[in-house]
């Protein structure tokens, strides 16, 4: 079901939406609105107060200095603000494509690390600062020099873990940056083997080693004077994040990710009339998203899911049952939950078991007992899709073909992961008459038929301004950077029919993993909490 178009003039608060059940008015008035109800249309513009002007464009808790200066300067020169439609004067009358990147620069301290950091210390930096990636200075003379840098993220940690577990063949790695440029391939392989053996013994391994093995897109930089249009084109081609530098390009002043950019576009959507058409159109009308989502079956092992994300160069997989019904999602960030020896046994448990474990941990840490599965259908409006992406801080939403009963009850009874776990654990209770069809799995969102990503949406916005984008460009570039393996070896790695052999290997590999992390006892507590 598509959403009604939002009104640009005098936007109404979702909290005051007319109640469709007058007799239950008191009950519904006290009910806590769902995320989707609150964010199905762009948020209203803030009140025209000086305090609101100060906080106008920042995606963080602090705004850029240039934003504050521009706002105060125009107010001091008598620019109208009370009762005016020009709420944010520094960009009054500007289209989103003309916005300078200085308006999106966070004034928070930029966190970065040096290439000499150990993998474990780099991982702790991600966890302690709640980051998904961190810039890495590769300068040998000045560790604060970020003019040339790479990034460390959870995909690197995943590669590191898979290497320790003997799940990656050397032929699958990019070895061009290892050792000296004149070293033979055999010599480079020898260096890799020696380094991995150090990791297995619990010795520290510098992140410079692992980030060179796991190819990424070049770390693209833009100056604060560049416009949002240029960044939209780059991120719309699948690059996950870019650096923003000062005007002289001598210092990185911030990192702009796809996730932060979509949040900015959503929070400021009412200022940009050119977005109206797209936000009110459905995914089907806009023809965005992929019809070939990458997935893992619920009964496959977690280690297989981690390998598949490595091999496919993706950061998330849909989790489905054998009827292709969507159950949930597994992310590359989830690798942090098995980076402790006490949880290593989960690597050889089913993906469904791991999802259940993640839910229990979130319940303990966040005090929540239910988590919705964030999916959409082809008739969902782009506004609804972006609202869910922003609310969940996700990079993608799964497109499903909803069965009639689930779709009719989706508003009053949103599908939760807990409900799907119950259905998966007790398939006979889902439907005694037709348990082998998606329609029989009442309680599941529906059959997985596609995926829509931040890349798709940002690419759509860039295309609307006349440029061409390829959502698969960056991913294909990452895949070309590594040596491909044969299809047969991949298929054998993710097959499901050899459970007994896998159990034997699991015990041996799990012991290797345990030795690697228990040796670094002083860091165990920091890792175990995640």
UniProtKB/Swiss-Prot annotation:
Q: Gene3D superfamilies of this UniProt entry?
A: CBS-domain (3.10.580.10)
Gene Ontology annotations for the cellular component aspect, listed alphabetically: cytoplasm; nucleus
- What spans are recorded as compositionally biased (Polar residues)? 1-21
The protein's matches in InterPro entries, at most eight in alphabetical order, are given as:
AMPK_gamma/SDS23_families (IPR050511), CBS_dom (IPR000644), CBS_dom_sf (IPR046342), Ssd23 (IPR016711)
Identify the stretch(es) annotated as Disordered.
1-51, 65-89, 467-509
Q: Which residues form the CBS domain?
A: 213-274, 289-347
One Gene Ontology molecular-function label: protein serine/threonine phosphatase inhibitor activity
Q: Name one Pfam family in it.
A: CBS
Instruction: Give the matching CDD domains.
Output: CBS_pair_SF (cd02205)
Q: What is its main location?
A: cytoplasm
Going by the UniProt record, its keywords in alphabetical order are: CBS domain, Cytoplasm, Nucleus, Repeat
Indicate where this protein resides in the cell: Cytoplasm; Nucleus
Function, in words: Involved in DNA replication and cell separation.
Give the record's family classification: Belongs to the SDS23 family.
Q: What is this protein called?
A: Protein SDS23
Q: What is the lineage of its organism?
A: Eukaryota, Fungi, Dikarya, Ascomycota, Saccharomycotina
């Amino acid at each position: 079901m598509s959403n009604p178009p939002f009104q640009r003039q005098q936007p109404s608060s979702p909290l005051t939406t007319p109640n469709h059940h007058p007799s239950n008015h008191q009950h519904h008035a006290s009910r806590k609105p769902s995320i989707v109800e609150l964010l199905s249309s762009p948020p209203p513009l803030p009140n025209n107060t000086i305090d609101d002007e100060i906080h106008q464009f920042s995606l963080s808790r602090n705004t850029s200095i240039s934003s504050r200066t521009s706002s105060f300067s125009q107010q001091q020169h008598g620019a109208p603000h009370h009762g005016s439609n020009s709420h944010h004067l520094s960009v009054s009358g500007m289209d989103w494509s003309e916005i300078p990147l200085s308006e999106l620069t966070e004034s928070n301290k930029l966190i970065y690390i040096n290439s000499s950091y150990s993998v474990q210390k780099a991982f702790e930096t991600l966890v302690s600062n709640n980051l998904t990636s961190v810039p890495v200075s590769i300068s040998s003379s000045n560790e604060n020099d970020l003019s040339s840098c790479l990034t460390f993220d959870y995909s690197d940690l995943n590669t590191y873990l898979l290497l320790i577990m003997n799940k990656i063949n050397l032929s699958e790695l990019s070895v061009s940056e290892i050792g000296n440029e004149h070293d033979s391939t055999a010599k480079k392989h020898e260096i890799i083997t020696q380094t991995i053996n150090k990791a297995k013994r619990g010795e520290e391994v510098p992140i410079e080693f692992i980030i060179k093995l796991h190819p990424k897109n070049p770390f693209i930089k833009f100056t604060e004077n560049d416009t949002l249009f240029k960044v939209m084109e780059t991120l719309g081609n699948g690059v996950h994040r870019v650096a923003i530098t000062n005007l002289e390009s001598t210092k990185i002043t911030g990192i702009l990710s796809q996730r932060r950019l979509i949040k900015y576009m959503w929070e400021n959507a009412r200022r940009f009339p050119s977005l109206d058409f797209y936000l009110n159109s459905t995914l089907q009308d806009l023809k965005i998203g992929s019809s070939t989502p990458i997935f893992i079956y619920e009964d496959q092992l977690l280690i297989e899911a981690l390998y598949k994300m490595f091999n496919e160069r993706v950061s998330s997989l849909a989790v489905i049952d054998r009827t292709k019904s969507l159950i949930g999602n597994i992310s590359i960030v989830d690798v942090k939950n098995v980076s402790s020896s006490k949880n290593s046994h989960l690597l050889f448990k089913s993906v469904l078991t791991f999802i259940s474990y993640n839910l229990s941990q979130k319940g303990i840490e966040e005090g929540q007992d239910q988590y919705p599965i964030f999916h959409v259908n082809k008739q969902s409006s782009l506004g609804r899709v972006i609202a869910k992406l922003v609310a969940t801080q996700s990079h993608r939403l799964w497109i499903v073909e909803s069965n009639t009963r689930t779709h009719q009850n989706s508003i009053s009874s949103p599908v939760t992961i807990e409900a799907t776990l119950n259905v998966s654990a007790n398939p006979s209770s889902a439907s005694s008459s037709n348990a082998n069809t998606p329609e029989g799995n009442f309680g599941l969102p529906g059959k997985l038929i596609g995926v829509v990503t931040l890349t798709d949406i940002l690419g759509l916005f860039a295309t609307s301004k006349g440029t061409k984008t390829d959502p698969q460009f960056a991913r294909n570039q990452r895949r070309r950077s590594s040596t491909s393996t044969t299809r047969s070896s991949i298929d054998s790695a993710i097959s499901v029919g050899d459970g007994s052999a896998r159990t034997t290997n699991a015990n041996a590999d799990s012991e290797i993993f345990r030795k690697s992390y228990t040796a670094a006892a002083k860091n165990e507590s920091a890792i175990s909490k995640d």
